[in-house]
Swiss-Prot record:
UniProt-listed InterPro entries: GHMP_kinase_C_dom (IPR013750), GHMP_kinase_C_sf (IPR036554), GHMP_kinase_N_dom (IPR006204), IspE (IPR004424), Ribosomal_Su5_D2-typ_SF (IPR020568), Ribsml_uS5_D2-typ_fold_subgr (IPR014721)
Name of the protein: 4-diphosphocytidyl-2-C-methyl-D-erythritol kinase
Record field: catalytic activity: 4-CDP-2-C-methyl-D-erythritol + ATP = 4-CDP-2-C-methyl-D-erythritol 2-phosphate + ADP + H(+)
Biological process according to GO: isopentenyl diphosphate biosynthetic process, methylerythritol 4-phosphate pathway; terpenoid biosynthetic process
Protein family according to the UniProt entry: Belongs to the GHMP kinase family. IspE subfamily.
Keywords: ATP-binding, Isoprene biosynthesis, Kinase, Nucleotide-binding, Transferase
EC number(s) stated in the UniProt entry for this protein: 2.7.1.148
Recorded name of the encoding gene: ispE
Molecular function via GO: 4-(cytidine 5'-diphospho)-2-C-methyl-D-erythritol kinase activity; ATP binding
Role, per record: Catalyzes the phosphorylation of the position 2 hydroxy group of 4-diphosphocytidyl-2C-methyl-D-erythritol.
Amino acid sequence: MQPTVIETWPAPAKLNLFLYITGQRQDGYHLLQTLFQFLDYGDTLTIRPRNDDQINLLTPIDGVENEQNLIIRAARLLQQHCERRNIRPAQFGANIHIEKCLPMGGGLGGGSSNAATVLVALNHLWQSGLNVDTLAELGLQLGADVPVFIRGYAAFAEGIGEQLTPANPPEKWYLVAHPSISIATPLIFGDPELTRNSPVRDLETLLNQTFVNDCEAIARKRFREVEQLLSWLLEYAPARLTGTGACVFAEFDTEFAARQVLDQAPEWLNGFVARGVNVSPLQRRLSGQR
């Protein structure tokens, strides 16, 4: 049976509604507790299968070599996995076009989301038949955040981010602002002043406390642009860093309230308004919803 032909696939952004660093493993990876929620906003990938095994990214991303791009790496990883298991679809290549909206180094999970979308979409288009657990295991080879995008549901994450428990935080509206800089994750996680000993708590406890991002103090101290953005946003609503930055977000109960603040934003602020959603737009697309 032929799959429903879907060419256009969302690669949504995520927010870390809170992020606590609880320790560090001997291999250098940080242990954390974080709450992931998706946004109804992100990149868009157009994917068309090919009858050969060529993987072509038709819209290269500035500053990223194709061979290092998570889009290409994800497609080839899926190819290799299928070949090892003697799964050889008639169409085993792809032409991929990306409409890039999410900033690099922004803490919105753009690269991880792109990788997840490629794995999910090509599994569908190639009729590979892999289940979500297998796709998530493949995704983890590409990055700790990839599995949550593959599974497609808001989640409480522990470990290095790969231990996921479904969660259902309020679906608020957010003004997400980007300071026109990129922050590489190793810069924050490698900072000697980063808090690495937050206490481990259960989700119920964390949901009833003020949400905090342990990376925020470092980002504000090291990057004046982040400090400037947060100082402005905090005049209007609760606001904090997502991931290791550089993006920050303020939360609102209505779209109107969020847009009112965006309309007052100074010229140097780059931002957008989006709704937090607990079911990923990618999951909705796969299940036939819009």
